[in-house]
From Swiss-Prot:
SUPFAM superfamilies: Recombination protein RecR. CDD domains: TOPRIM_recR. Keywords: DNA damage, DNA recombination, DNA repair, Metal-binding, Zinc, Zinc-finger. A zinc finger (C4-type) spans 57-72. May play a role in DNA repair. It seems to be involved in an RecBC-independent recombinational process of DNA repair. It may act with RecF and RecO. Residues 81-176 form the Toprim domain. Belongs to the RecR family. PANTHER family: RECOMBINATION PROTEIN RECR. One of its GO terms (molecular function) is DNA binding. GO terms for biological process: DNA recombination; DNA repair. It comes from Edwardsiella ictaluri (strain 93-146). This is Recombination protein RecR.
Length: 201
């Protein structure tokens, strides 16, 4: 069946989103055109503004419309002395929702992957090293993902921190709250046993 070139273009554009295949893209496109054109216009305007106006923070590399993000300009957070290293801006959002961290961040926008040609400078580690040498950093919290690449990246950064006399710590990995022990994979269980702590009363 021959369809509108514009409709085909819309469906193809929607497929750039993660997890969206041909059928999902078709369903979204028809929904916007048939039932929610005003929502489609708002989406188009928001996307256009976001793509043109959102850049990266000069200090931590997260997404922001300003040269420096609000977290990095917060005096209380600057005095904290902690930098939490994460792989993506989405990780910052997740950590902020816990309300348990009051320092600043550094976003790698990925992880080390020599097989893919991704080295230290590709994920901004040269800029992190500048911060370690110029700022009063007391601790770097390594919150990269618990993958082979994430662990390799964390180890590399830990060595950088040691060279600058800065404490490096790794976030704990283990059994999820509400999970059943028999369903947990061996690697996670190993991390849990290695990272056990005394029970306090």
């Amino acid at each position: 069946m021959q369809t509108s070139p514009l409709l085909e273009s819309l469906m193809e554009a929607l497929r750039c989103l993660p997890g969206v295949g041909p059928k999902s893209a078709q369903r979204m496109a028809f929904h916007l055109l048939q039932r929610d054109r005003s929502g489609g216009m708002r989406l188009a305007q928001a996307l256009t503004r976001a793509m043109s106006e959102i850049g990266h923070c000069r200090d931590c590399r997260t997404f922001t419309e300003q040269e420096v993000c609000t977290i990095c300009t917060n005096a209380r957070r600057r005095e904290n002395g902690q930098i939490c290293v994460v792989e993506s801006p989405a990780d910052i959002h997740a950590i902020e929702q816990t309300g348990q961290y009051s320092g600043r961040y550094f976003v790698l926008m990925g992880h080390l992957s020599p097989l893919d040609g991704i080295g230290p400078q590709d994920i901004g580690l040269d800029r992190l090293e500048v911060r370690l040498s110029q700022e009063a950093v007391s601790e770097v919290i390594l919150a990269t993902n618990p993958t082979v690449e994430g662990e390799a990246t964390a180890n590399y950064i830990a060595e950088m921190c040691a060279a600058h006399g800065v404490l490096a710590s790794r976030i704990a990995h283990g059994v999820p709250v509400g999970g059943e022990l028999e369903m947990v994979d061996g690697t996670t269980l190993s991390h849990s046993l290695a990272g056990r702590h005394p029970v306090t009363r």
